[in-house]
Swiss-Prot record:
GO biological process, one term: protein quality control for misfolded or incompletely synthesized proteins
Name of a matching Pfam family: Pept_tRNA_hydro
Hydrolase listed as a keyword: yes
UniProt-listed Gene3D superfamilies: Peptidyl-tRNA hydrolase
Designated name of the protein: Peptidyl-tRNA hydrolase
Gene behind the chain: pth
Matching CDD domains: PTH
Residues the record marks as site: Discriminates between blocked and unblocked aminoacyl-tRNA: 9
Enzyme class, UniProt record, top EC level: hydrolase
Compartment(s): Cytoplasm
Subunit structure and binding partners: Monomer.
Keyword annotations: Cytoplasm, Hydrolase, RNA-binding, tRNA-binding
SUPFAM superfamilies: Peptidyl-tRNA hydrolase-like
Length: 195
């Protein structure tokens, strides 16, 4: 079993913000897994299903970003999962818009949701999918703002590709997913992409 956690903030106010890119990817994975992410468990909304034959738990913590570790550690305990069975999906200021990056482990990179998870788990040795949202002078306003109108045309392709990358990591392993998706980039405003 794999636990795929998309990071974000709960509530309609934050639904379409850059910081909720992880939630958006989990919503796309839910359709592919034949589930809905709407049951309350371990400070999260969860749904269970199968993704390419692999049993998955999809989760969206409801603790707000800075306390994501509370939910993730509770989920790992509840489902009795090892860190290798966890995949966290989040936004990344240090990655340009139109890029995704998978990593087997690493620091928080200043992402407070990741920092909370690392602190709660006592380890940074868990895989993650990072979705580039680009930098801005006011980082807080940027992550809590909605995607710019000029980014909307490519956003669906980015989120769908991140979902494919997560599914590939579950089915074929993280190394294969990194090989296949870390070089992917959205090529133009009309959503044309390359892998």
């Amino acid at each position: 079993m794999k636990l795929i956690v998309g990071l974000g903030n709960p509530g309609a106010k934050y639904r379409f913000t850059r910081h909720n890119a992880g939630f958006m990817v989990v919503d796309r994975l839910a359709g592919a897994a034949g589930t809905t992410v709407n049951r309350r468990r371990c400070f999260s909304l969860v749904g269970e299903g199968r993704l390419n034959g692999v049993r998955v738990v999809l989760a969206k913590p409801q603790t707000y970003m800075n306390l994501s570790g509370l939910a993730v550690s509770a989920l790992c305990r509840h489902y009795r999962l090892e860190l290798a069975d966890l995949l966290v999906i989040c936004d990344d200021l240090d990655l340009e818009f139109g890029r995704i990056r998978l990593r087997p482990k690493g620091g928080s990179g200043g992402h407070r949701g990741l920092a909370s998870i690392i602190a709660a788990l006592g380890s940074s040795d868990f895989p993650r999918v990072r979705i580039g949202i680009g930098k801005a002078e006011d980082a807080s306003a940027h992550v809590l703002g909605e995607f710019a109108p000029e980014d909307q045309s490519g956003l669906e392709e980015i989120l769908s590709t991140a979902a494919l990358a997560a599914a590939c990591a579950c089915r074929e392993g993280l190394d294969e997913a990194m090989s296949r998706f870390n070089s992917w980039r959205l090529m133009s405003a009309n959503g044309t992409a390359e892998v």
